[in-house]
Swiss-Prot record:
It comes from Daucus carota. This is Unknown protein 5.
Length: 13
């Protein structure tokens, strides 16, 4: 999603 939070990206993955 690349919303701006690398941490969130990890959760989405």
């Amino acid at each position: 999603t690349s919303s701006g939070c690398p941490n969130f990206e990890s959760l989405v993955r």
